[in-house]
Regions:
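Major-groove DNA-recognition helix of helix-turn-helix-type DNA-binding domains
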Residues: 16-36
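Arg/Lys-rich, alpha-helical DNA-contact motif
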Residues: 2-8, 41-122
Length: 122
């Protein structure tokens, strides 16, 4: 299967798929023409791996973390804990921002300077 078909099948962009190859998250077979251009041939396994990687990325696993899990499933314990901690911190940060924003009158029009001043007071 060619890269365009994989994009359509997975919903991933060409760039995302190529990055997964560059980062050695997947290793599809390929042929190289005389100009050095690679023509990839993706297997069903490659597509499954891309879909799995996409799910992990949606939950903010980094490419380095995904590589570690690919190479050693035991690392998933620590990595999952790290992702949970990061997500909890993101939620806390968002709640703090919402609390500050809730204190500002949204019925009034503000300039950028006025809005920045109001936000910096909180």
């Amino acid at each position: 299967m060619k890269i365009k078909s994989v994009c359509e099948l997975t919903g991933l962009t060409d760039r995302t798929i190529r990055r997964s190859i560059e980062e050695k998250l997947i290793s599809p077979l390929y042929t190289e023409n005389y100009l050095g251009r690679k023509n990839y041939n993706f297997s069903d396994r490659d597509i499954k791996d891309l879909n799995d990687i996409a799910v992990l990325r949606k939950f903010d696993f980094t490419l380095d973390e995904i590589k570690l899990v690919i190479n050693d499933a035991e690392t998933s314990k620590e990595i999952l804990s790290n992702v949970k901690d990061r997500t909890a911190q993101t939620v806390l940060d968002s709640q703090n921002k919402l609390s500050v924003l809730s204190q500002i009158n949204n019925e009034k029009a503000y300039t950028v300077a006025e809005l920045a001043e109001e936000l910096s007071k909180a």
